[in-house]
UniProtKB/Swiss-Prot annotation:
Protein name per its UniProtKB record: Uncharacterized protein MJ0150
Pfam families documented for this protein: V4R
Transmembrane segments: none
InterPro entries, sorted: NO_sig/Golgi_transp_ligand-bd, V4R
Annotated SMART domains: V4R (SM00989)
Family to which the UniProt record says this protein belongs: Belongs to the M.jannaschii MJ0150/MJ0739/MJ0745/MJ1460/MJ1642 family.
Length: 173
């Protein structure tokens, strides 16, 4: 069999549209229902993580791209964290709470997180996608370089996920 070239741009547009439709209360129609069971999503997600090969960085960057290109469009810069929390809840990613906000640093809590809710203590953080989503969304809205690192996770036996968000001084765009 010959190599089949995947149309990554078409897939990217499809994912972007599906997320936008979900946020706008128009999820794609499907005979079996619009949502997959959390256990199936987590099985695939954790299966990918166990493959190794630096996949965590890839998952983080996917989250960052989606945050920057999709989620940020629905977040109000003047009401940044509150509107971001609304979007994450609406997209069923998790319930965002603010623990600390300073000029160049935040600590954000994510409860009922899609990647690790009800996961047993496996000894490591699991929410690289959510960390990327936080970084990408805030980076786009603040026009500053942002990095988010998960410091607490249900995958480490914690009750919720916690992210340390570092914001660089330099403005861009």
């Amino acid at each position: 069999m010959g190599d089949v070239k995947m149309d990554k741009e078409l897939l990217h547009k499809k994912i972007k549209k599906d997320i936008e439709d979900l946020i706008n209360n128009h999820p794609p129609e499907r005979t079996l229902g619009n949502l997959i069971p959390l256990s199936i999503f987590q099985a695939v997600r954790i299966g990918v993580l166990t493959a190794g090969c630096g996949i965590e960085a890839i998952i983080y960057n996917i989250g960052k791209d989606i945050g920057r290109e999709v989620i940020s469009r629905y977040v109000d810069r003047d009401n940044l964290l509150e509107s971001f929390a609304e979007i994450l809840k609406k997209a069923k990613i998790g319930i965002l709470e603010v623990k600390k906000v300073e000029e160049n640093e935040m600590i954000l809590i994510l409860k009922d997180c899609i990647s690790c809710h009800n996961v047993p203590n496996v000894g490591t953080t699991l929410c690289h996608f959510e960390a990327g989503l936080i970084a990408g969304t805030l980076e786009k809205k603040l026009r500053r370089k942002v990095n988010a690192v998960e410091t607490k996770c249900c995958g480490k036996g914690d009750e919720y996920c916690e992210f340390l968000v570092k914001i660089e001084d330099k403005l861009y765009w």
